[in-house]
Amino acid sequence: MKIRKKSYGNCNMVGRNIERLRKERGIKQKDFISKMQTMGCDINPTSYSKLEGQLRIATDKEIYTVARILTVSMEDLFE
């Protein structure tokens, strides 16, 4: 597992939780991105990394898709 090179930003509230939940489920970042793309999210690895790192704003579609993949409510991503 790679160590995060940069500290977390403050552009969104969900990035850390997405990263934590994804890792708890043993899903690799590249596999998670593929699932998001399959579900209609136009996202690339750099953009996804910035999302988890809280370095960019998360769209409503991304939050919805992530919640579905992780089988959690959207509200859970904000806790």
Report residues per predicted region.
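Short polybasic/polar patches that bind polyanions
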Residues: 23, 37, 68
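Short alpha-helical DNA-recognition segment
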Residues: 26-50
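Helix-turn-helix DNA-binding elements, focusing on the entry/boundary residues of the two helices
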Residues: 18, 29, 45, 60-63
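A short, Lys/Arg-rich alpha-helix, primarily the initiator
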Residues: 1-25
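Short, conserved catalytic or interaction motifs in soluble domains
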Residues: 53
